[in-house]
Swiss-Prot record:
InterPro entries: Acylphosphatase-like_dom, Acylphosphatase-like_dom_sf, Acylphosphatase_CS, Carbamoyltrans_HypF-like, Carbamoyltransferase_HypF, DHBP_synth_RibB-like_a/b_dom, HypF_C, HypF_C_2. It catalyses: C-terminal L-cysteinyl-[HypE protein] + carbamoyl phosphate + ATP + H2O = C-terminal S-carboxamide-L-cysteinyl-[HypE protein] + AMP + phosphate + diphosphate + H(+). The lineage of its organism: Bacteria, Pseudomonadati, Pseudomonadota, Alphaproteobacteria, Rhodobacterales. Residues 3-87 form the Acylphosphatase-like domain. Pfam families: Acylphosphatase, HypF_C, HypF_C_2, Sua5_yciO_yrdC, zf-HYPF. The keyword Transport does not apply. Pathway: Protein modification; [NiFe] hydrogenase maturation. Keywords: Ligase, Metal-binding, Zinc, Zinc-finger. It is an enzyme of class 6 (ligase). Its EC number is 6.2.-.-. This is Carbamoyltransferase HypF. Belongs to the carbamoyltransferase HypF family. It comes from Rhodobacter capsulatus (Rhodopseudomonas capsulata).
Length: 739
């Protein structure tokens, strides 16, 4: 009888893949064995395969991702009669980590049905439920998760041991008799009664609840109750930053415009927050000045039960102090969230690691924040990087996330936040140690941002010194370039690409602050071809939060000082101009982000101070009309001059048309310069990256101006600094080889 050795690679551990193989094999009368190992899943089988190999890919379980099915003839004299799943142990241990997944339809039907899990908030199976958020160490089994304290009852044990059951080896398996417990507490005491019903009643009464979710606590309130929303804003001291919402699918159509692509994203097992056009049926204070709302579907049984009992739409925003990481522990929540929440919906299953909600857009598709449900999935490295050494890269100061390279794959870590916040810095250090231990990573090089004062850069330098391995400092926008190429699997020797990088800031090799760049390069190096005409950042970092400073210098440069004086009468203009003239705490910057701030300030959008990062630019995007003037921005000696945009203001153009002009003119100017490189044969393709390209209007316009060119964009990896570490790691790998 012919025997075969079948190797399956991808996300195939912890997703019910072995029982799936067992069922396929038994249905086809095959004999053999299936097991997990360090490379994925290994199948040793004898008999007529027929469509068996194709079915492994085509009929895989919902959470599986099959990257490769490799079939080779083999001699398998020791195969058992029938088909077996290898017992747990070194061979059978699950060594890959799967992201957390939203409740599957079968489990949802159970909690709404009449069986033993009716109304049970911790129902899960191999197709859904917690994974990364409960994992404490590898291999992945119950004893190494936060489910270890909960001994299985006989009924759960029987399901766990039955290969025909969808809970076969589901490590978080639980039921009301043996699993975690849910309760509501207020005033330091647990309240008697149905926790879900009590919580829903309090939400209907306008109270704010702290709700323990999958990767941390949320603060929840009735999204239709303007007083409750205002109270939450006052308590959190969060005057304008948009709140995320949670809604059942049947409630979506009345609050947002749901496209087929948005619905698909909402239903994805990652269950991200999806940005969609608002219908105007909810209080404007949910997202002041924004045309979109961020909405997610319930993604745990607890959320489904709560939304069913409440019967409406909830605000579901991170449970944290302003700027601090999301709270994950019960005692921590009682200590830190009591000033915000009237009551706590809590449980006794511990959260092993903090995971924020992921955030996506769908038009065009892009990940804005990569976290719960999307990590820790691995990414294949582009051709040419197969033998890259183990590298750790630490990203930047904002939207921090680290990246590991190992065995031809990259593992981009979860969103951590801004590293200038002390608690976020602690979380960063914990994540560094956590990932190194969890994935047995032993770096042979360390990559950091070129800016030596970034906390992550200093940390990386210290670690490289301790390990005695090379430290590779990567220019900020070169890292963005490489991250975009890497996501698109651009070969290491695939030729140079014209890359438009528009973002907030990054230290340039010339000592100025970059942020509006056209680069020509690859993983190994780059040259700067065009850039936004630099302007001083008056007050340094203060220019990032006070848009009038950027407006003042741009208006002055356009010969419109009188207009600046009229627009900003209360600002210390004379002092600011003196600092700019003398170059005192006023570094030159080509930042596109600060140009958006400047135009927004001129239009009266938070001119004196932004209440959160990106507020001015986001509100400007929402304001922009669909049509309007598109003034040409001259490019002289590589410097693109935005002065004509400010002339529109002086001419009295409508604010929405000025906002349109900024997007269209900036897109047109950089697209024209990129096109020249393509037409001259200097570049093989054009790429768009940097945080400004998370502005869907800017991204779409730039793509339209380059419609007949090969365009590389980022969809699965954040174009903002959340993807920076991947680019750093790839640049480091390329430089190590070339050296």
């Amino acid at each position: 009888m012919q025997a075969w050795r079948i190797r399956v690679r991808g996300q195939v551990q912890g997703v019910g893949f072995r029982p799936f193989v067992w069922q396929l094999a038994r249905a086809r009368g095959l004999r053999g064995v299936v097991l997990n190992d360090a490379e994925g899943v290994l199948i040793r089988v004898a008999g007529d395969l027929g469509d068996f190999a194709a079915a492994l890919r085509d009929q895989a379980p919902p959470l599986a991702r099959v990257d490769a099915v490799e079939v080779t003839a083999a001699v398998c004299d020791d195969l058992p009669e029938g088909f077996q799943i290898a017992a747990s142990g070194a061979a059978g241990a699950e060594t890959r980590v799967t992201p957390d997944a939203a409740t599957c339809p079968d489990c949802l039907a159970e909690i709404r049905g009449e069986g033993r899990r009716r109304g049970y908030a911790f129902t899960n199976c191999t197709h859904c439920g917690p994974r990364f958020s409960i994992l404490q160490s590898l291999p992945y089994d119950r004893a190494r998760t936060t489910m270890a304290p909960f001994a299985m009852c006989p009924a759960c044990r029987a399901e766990y041991e039955d290969p025909a059951d969808r809970r076969f080896h589901a490590q978080p398996i639980a039921c009301p008799d043996c699993g975690p417990r849910l309760w509501l507490e207020a005033g330091g005491a647990e309240l008697p009664g149905d926790a879900i019903g009590l919580a829903a009643a309090r939400l209907k009464a306008g109270e704010i609840l702290a709700v323990k979710g999958l990767g941390g606590f949320h603060l929840a309130c009735d999204a239709t109750n303007a007083d409750a929303v205002d109270l939450l804003r006052a308590r959190k001291r969060r005057p304008a930053k948009p709140f995320a919402l949670m809604a059942r699918e049947e409630d979506l159509a009345r609050i947002v415009a749901v496209s087929p692509a948005a619905l698909a994203a909402l239903r994805d097992p990652a269950a991200p927050i999806v940005l969609m056009p608002a219908r105007g049926s909810l209080p404007e204070t949910l997202a002041p000045g924004m045309a979109e709302l961020g909405v997610m579907l319930p993604y745990t049984p607890l959320h489904h039960l709560l939304l069913d009992a409440f019967g409406g739409v909830l605000v579901m925003t991170s449970g944290n102090l302003s700027g601090a990481p999301q709270v994950i522990g019960n005692d921590e929540a009682r200590e830190k969230l009591s000033a915000f929440a009237d009551a706590f919906l809590m449980h006794d299953r511990a959260i092993a690691r903090r995971l924020d909600d992921s955030v996506v857009r769908v038009d065009p598709p892009m990940v804005l924040r990569r976290a719960r449900g999307q990590v820790p999935g691995t990414l294949p490295l582009p051709p040419g990087f197969e033998t890259a050494p183990q590298i750790v890269a630490y990203g930047g100061q904002m939207k921090a996330a680290l990246c590991l390279i190992k065995t031809g794959q990259a593992l981009l870590g979860h969103h951590l936040g801004e590293l200038d916040e002390a608690l976020t810095w602690e979380a960063f250090l914990q994540a560094d140690a956590d990932y190194a231990a969890l994935f047995d990573h032993r770096p042979q090089a360390v990559a950091v941002d070129l800016h030596p004062d970034f906390r992550a850069s200093r940390h990386g330098a210290a670690r490289a010194g301790r390990l005695g391995v090379p430290l590779i400092a990567v220019q900020h926008h070169h890292a963005h370039l490489a991250a975009c190429l890497g996501e698109n699997l651009w070969p290491k020797d695939g030729g140079k690409v014209a890359v438009i990088v528009l973002d907030g800031l990054g230290l340039g090799p010339d000592g100025t602050v970059w942020g509006g760049e056209l680069l020509l390069g690859d993983y190994k190096g780059f040259e700067r071809v065009a850039w936004l005409k630099p302007a001083p950042l008056i007050g340094g970092d203060r220019a990032q939060i006070e848009p009038w400073r950027n407006a003042l210098v741009r208006l002055d440069a356009a010969g419109l000082s009188d207009l600046a004086d009229r627009l900003f009468p209360a600002a210390p203009r004379d002092l600011a101009r003196q600092l700019a003239a003398k170059g005192i705490n006023a570094p030159l910057s080509s930042s596109a982000g600060r140009l958006f701030d400047a135009v927004a300030a001129c239009l009266g959008i938070c001119p004196m101070r932004q209440s959160y990062e990106g507020e001015a630019a986001m509100r400007l995007e929402s304001l922009a009309a669909d049509t309007g003037p598109v003034p040409d921005l001259p490019c002289v000696g590589g410097a693109i001059d935005p002065a004509p945009l400010f002339q529109l203001l002086a001419a009295g153009e409508r604010p929405d048309r000025v906002a349109h002009a900024l997007h269209a003119s900036l897109a047109q100017a950089f697209a024209a310069e990129a096109r020249r490189l393509i037409e001259a044969g200097q570049a093989e393709a054009v790429a768009l990256t940097g945080g400004c390209f998370q502005n869907s209007r800017l991204a779409t316009m730039t793509r339209n101006f380059l419609a007949d060119q090969g365009i590389l964009t980022q969809g699965r990896i954040p174009a903002n600094d959340g993807g920076l570490a991947l680019g750093q790691a790839l640049v480091a790998a390329a430089k190590l080889e070339s050296n």
